[in-house]
Amino acid sequence: MSHSVKIYDTCIGCTQCVRACPTDVLEMIPWDGCKAKQIASAPRTEDCVGCKRCESACPTDFLSVRVYLWHETTRSMGLAY
C-alpha cells in the first residue's frame, strides 16, 4: 500500500527529515521561499514504509512534513462525498 507524503511551505530547509528517512523517500530541492534556499521534496513516495521518522525529526512547531498512511487517506477521502 502506498502512503502519501506532504511537504508544507513551513519547511525551513534544515534537512532533518531527509536524513531521518530510512528509505530515501525525501530529497532537498532548490526553493527561494525560505532562508536555506531549499525545501524537502518527496519524489519517491512509493518507497515510504510509513515509519513517520521524518515527522519526528521535523523541528518546526507545525510539522512541515506529514505522512498520511494509506488507510488514513482512504478514510478522509470517503468523508468528502
Curated annotation (Swiss-Prot):
GO terms for cellular component: chloroplast; chloroplast stromal thylakoid; chloroplast thylakoid; chloroplast thylakoid membrane; photosystem I; plastid. Its main location: plastid. [4Fe-4S] cluster 2 binds at residues 21, 48, 51, 54. SUPFAM superfamilies: 4Fe-4S ferredoxins. InterPro entries: 4Fe4S_Fe-S-bd (IPR017896), 4Fe4S_Fe_S_CS (IPR017900), PSI_iron-sulfur_center (IPR050157), PSI_PsaC (IPR017491). It holds the Pfam family Fer4_21. It is found in: Plastid, Chloroplast thylakoid membrane. It is an enzyme of class 1 (oxidoreductase). [4Fe-4S] cluster 1 binds at residues 11, 14, 17, 58. Its cofactor is [4Fe-4S] cluster. GO terms for biological process: photosynthesis; photosynthetic electron transport in photosystem I. It is a peripheral membrane protein. Keywords: 4Fe-4S, Chloroplast, Electron transport, Iron, Iron-sulfur, Membrane, Metal-binding, Oxidoreductase, Photosynthesis, Photosystem I, Plastid, Repeat, Thylakoid, Transport. One of its GO terms (molecular function) is oxidoreductase activity. Binds 2 [4Fe-4S] clusters. Cluster 2 is most probably the spectroscopically characterized electron acceptor FA and cluster 1 is most probably FB. It catalyses: reduced [plastocyanin] + hnu + oxidized [2Fe-2S]-[ferredoxin] = oxidized [plastocyanin] + reduced [2Fe-2S]-[ferredoxin]. Its EC number is 1.97.1.12. Residues 2-31, 39-68 form the 4Fe-4S ferredoxin-type domain. The eukaryotic PSI reaction center is composed of at least 11 subunits. Apoprotein for the two 4Fe-4S centers FA and FB of photosystem I (PSI); essential for photochemical activity. FB is the terminal electron acceptor of PSI, donating electrons to ferredoxin. The C-terminus interacts with PsaA/B/D and helps assemble the protein into the PSI complex. Required for binding of PsaD and PsaE to PSI. PSI is a plastocyanin-ferredoxin oxidoreductase, converting photonic excitation into a charge separation, which transfers an electron from the donor P700 chlorophyll pair to the spectroscopically characterized acceptors A0, A1, FX, FA and FB in turn. This is Photosystem I iron-sulfur center. It comes from Arabidopsis thaliana (Mouse-ear cress).
